[in-house]
Structure formats: structure tokens, C-alpha cells
Design a protein with these regions (language model features):
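Non-catalytic alpha-helical scaffolds and adjoining flexible linkers that form interface surfaces
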Residues: 1-19, 24-210
Length: 210
């Protein structure tokens, strides 16, 4: 039996009474698991796209058990925050396949969920998570001082190997957040376009009221 912390990124019906869930964990990468009896009321509430959960599964890729890490007010999320969940799950499902035990994706994703659950400004947390997804998938953008200076229009020097300095810089300035978010929209669009992946909605729709 295997145990791991994972994000459920997609849920499909499997035969008459079961579910097929796609998930990502830093320990095992992308996995598809069968949840036998997953459509029952007892089990169905445990498997929701976007939840961060502890999953137990066997070598036959059958899900044996799951437990939520933290509950969130999903029904209180407005359409923009719900689209953030759809968007991030889409990116992870399309771009991440291999395990990466050094990845901070799950930690950054949890930060994003907490910010949205608290109705806080989540734009910086979203940007940092996007950068980590791109890094883990091998498409990390150049974040050298010259690029940051060109994007934000100032004389800044940050550690390109860590997102903490960038995060601190963006949190101090709402205008910088919007500018860098527009930059990320172009970066994501270019990566997906090169891979012939079509984003089902415009990224700007998820930050319209942030």
C-alpha cells in the first residue's frame, strides 16, 4: 500500500458506480486511480476536484482511502475563485507527469487555498504557484534581474532561484501585481501554445475581481 499527499485534478465516471480520479503528488507524480463505489453518497463528498488530500492506494491503482487535509468553504467561493481551482487543476493535469520530491507545488497550492478561503488577495499566491508548476514541468521563465527590470520597469535585484523575494516585492505594490500577472498570462499562453494545449477559458477571467 502507498500513501501520499496529493491534489485531485480531475474526476471522471468509471463504469456504473465508480470514479476515475486524476491526481498529482510530488512523491509519485501524476496518477490515475479507480475509486470503487465512488459514486455513493458516503464516498462522493471525499472526492472533489481541487481538494488537497492524503490518498492511500495499491499497486493496482485502486484508491483505498482518503482524508482531507483541511476543509474549505467551497460553496462560498465566487465564480472567480472556483475558476482559479479549475485553472490550476488544468495546468497541473496537462503539464506535470513525473515525481519531483523537491517541488513546492503542494505547499504553494495550500497557501493559495488558504488565501481564497479567507477572502484575501490571492494574486501573488497564484503567480508563485504558476511559476512552480512551470519550473517542475521544465518551462520555467527567465527571472533574471534584466527580465524583472523590463517587466516591472524598475531597478530591482531578486534571487531568481527563490520566489520569496519576488513575492515580497509584488505584495508591496498592487500595480506590480497586475503588471506581473499580465506577464505570466503571456508566458503561460506561450507554453500551452507550443504544446498545442488549449486553455478552456481566458486566464484573465480568474483574476477579474481580485
Amino acid at each position: 500500500m502507498f500513501k501520499t499527499l496529493a491534489i485531485i485534478t480531475k474526476i471522471d465516471n468509471y463504469k456504473e458506480h465508480h470514479l476515475l480520479i486524476s491526481l498529482f503528488s510530488c512523491e509519485y507524480g501524476k496518477k490515475s486511480l479507480i475509486v470503487f463505489g465512488g459514486k455513493s453518497k458516503k464516498k462522493n463528498t471525499d472526492f472533489v476536484k481541487g481538494v488537497l488530500t492524503k490518498i492511500e492506494f495499491n499497486k493496482e491503482n485502486s484508491c483505498l482511502n482518503s482524508s482531507l487535509i483541511q476543509s474549505y468553504n467551497w460553496f462560498l467561493f465566487d465564480k472567480y475563485r472556483l475558476k482559479v481551482i479549475d485553472y490550476i487543476c488544468f495546468l497541473i493535469n496537462k503539464l506535470l507527469f513525473l515525481e519531483d520530491k523537491n517541488s513546492e507545488i503542494l505547499n504553494y497550492y495550500q497557501r493559495l487555498l488558504i488565501a481564497m478561503n479567507n477572502s484575501s488577495n490571492y494574486l501573488v499566491d497564484l503567480i508563485v504557484l504558476e511559476l512552480e508548476v512551470l519550473k517542475s514541468s521544465g518551462y520555467q521563465p527567465d527571472l533574471s534581474d534584466s527580465v524583472i527590470k523590463k517587466v516591472l520597469g524598475g531597478d530591482f535585484s531578486i534571487n531568481a532561484n527563490s520566489y520569496e523575494e519576488l513575492s515580497t516585492l509584488l505584495r508591496k505594490n498592487q500595480n506590480f501585481q497586475e503588471i506581473f500577472s499580465n506577464f505570466m498570462e503571456k508566458v503561460i499562453a506561450k507554453v500551452l501554445n507550443n504544446l498545442n494545449i488549449h486553455l478552456p477559458f481566458n486566464r484573465s477571467e480568474i483574476i477579474q475581481k481580485n
